[in-house]
């Protein structure tokens, strides 16, 4: 429950991996910190959408699933027991005369000296197929998320998309499905070179450059009508499941309502991760600056920068930061 009379040092808005690590590091620095997360659990998009998908850009791990990463971060975070508000959305960030902020949320107000925005891609919805289909086919034949690999076991599966996520899903599905196809409208894939190499050397059947332009149900399976780009050639592919990876449409309008300066729907920050608002910082995928690389690994590096800079502003008289080996 929110306590409107308690003054936190730092409020982290967003409980994804980067927000969780920011709260942990703030705890290391003896800050009074809380996390506000709109979802029912911590972990953000990684935990909600991709619990069984392996992540390859976290230092120290050859590969780690979203669920494993979230569990590790939760165990780490528990060391300092930060206040955590789940299923709570921030509606407004209101500056006060004394330099603090009142946050209006869906569950009341909370008071904080500083804010770290770590909301990932904001509210997101999957970019859907641009063809008509029966609504009941969704989550039966057609999937936009793949939370459990077991549902694809021994199935014929098509993956639509040509980026990192589509390639990664296809490679994971190859381990459990009877047959995997990947359908992309371009000849070239847009994934990491190592992932594309793995795809080319796999048993996955590649359908390029094709676009799905029709769907029909045939004997409890899904028939895909494939149109070859810049051609009248057509193919039909019959599958048990279709996993669509066309990316997500993000809604970051609330950030502008908070008074933050945006650049192409992301929060503009300087090299200290500071926004245009005093004592408000942004990290992770929502933050942008020249040379930004949108990886979890980048966000993990941005978190200590934001925490350190914020605490320096709040408590300039305190000794600034020690190595973890000196304080743990």
From Swiss-Prot:
Enzyme Commission number: 1.18.1.2
Reaction(s) the record says it catalyses: 2 reduced [2Fe-2S]-[ferredoxin] + NADP(+) + H(+) = 2 oxidized [2Fe-2S]-[ferredoxin] + NADPH
Cofactor, how bound (note): Binds 1 FAD per subunit.
Molecular function GO labels: ferredoxin-NADP+ reductase activity; flavin adenine dinucleotide binding; NADP binding
Enzyme class, spelled out: oxidoreductase
Binding-site residues for FAD, renumbered to this chain: 37, 45, 50, 90, 124, 285, 325
InterPro entries per the UniProt record, alphabetical: FAD/NAD-bd_sf, FAD/NAD-binding_dom, Fd--NADP_Rdtase_type_2, Ferredoxin-NADP_redctase_2
HAMAP family named in the record: FENR2 (MF_01685)
Subunit structure: Homodimer.
Similarity remark: Belongs to the ferredoxin--NADP reductase type 2 family.
Name recorded for this polypeptide: Ferredoxin--NADP reductase 2
């Amino acid at each position: 429950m929110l306590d409107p009379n308690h003054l936190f040092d730092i409020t982290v808005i967003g409980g994804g991996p980067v927000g969780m690590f920011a709260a942990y590091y703030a705890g290391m620095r003896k800050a009074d910190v809380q996390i506000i997360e709109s979802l029912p659990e911590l972990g953000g998009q990684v935990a909600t959408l991709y619990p069984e998908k392996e992540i390859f850009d976290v230092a120290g791990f050859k590969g780690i699933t979203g669920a494993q990463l979230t569990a590790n971060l939760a165990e780490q975070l528990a060391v300092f027991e930060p206040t955590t508000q789940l299923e709570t959305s921030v509606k407004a960030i209101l500056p006060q005369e004394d330099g603090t902020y009142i946050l209006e949320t869906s569950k009341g107000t909370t008071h904080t000296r500083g804010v770290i925005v770590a909301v990932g891609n904001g509210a997101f919805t999957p970019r859907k197929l641009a063809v008509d289909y029966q609504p009941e086919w969704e989550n039966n034949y057609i999937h936009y998320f793949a939370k459990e690999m077991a549902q694809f076991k021994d199935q014929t599966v098509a993956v639509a998309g040509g980026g990192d996520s589509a390639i990664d899903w296809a490679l994971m599905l190859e381990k459990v499905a009877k047959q995997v196809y990947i359908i992309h409208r371009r000849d070239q894939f847009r994934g990491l070179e190592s992932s594309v190499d793995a795809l080319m050397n796999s048993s996955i059947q590649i359908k390029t450059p094709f676009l799905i332009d029709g769907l029909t149900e045939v004997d409890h399976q899904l028939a895909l009508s494939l149109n070859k780009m810049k051609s009248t050639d057509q193919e039909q592919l019959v599958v048990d499941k279709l996993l669509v990876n066309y990316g997500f449409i993000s809604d970051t309008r609330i950030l502008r309502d908070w008074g933050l300066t945006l650049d192409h729907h992301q929060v503009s920050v300087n090299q200290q991760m500071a926004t245009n608002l005093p004592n408000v910082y942004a990290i992770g995928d929502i933050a942008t600056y020249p040379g930004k690389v949108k990886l979890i690994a980048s966000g993990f590096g941005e978190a200590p920068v934001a925490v350190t800079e914020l605490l320096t502003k709040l408590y300039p008289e305190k000794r600034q930061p020690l190595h973890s080996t000196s304080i743990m």
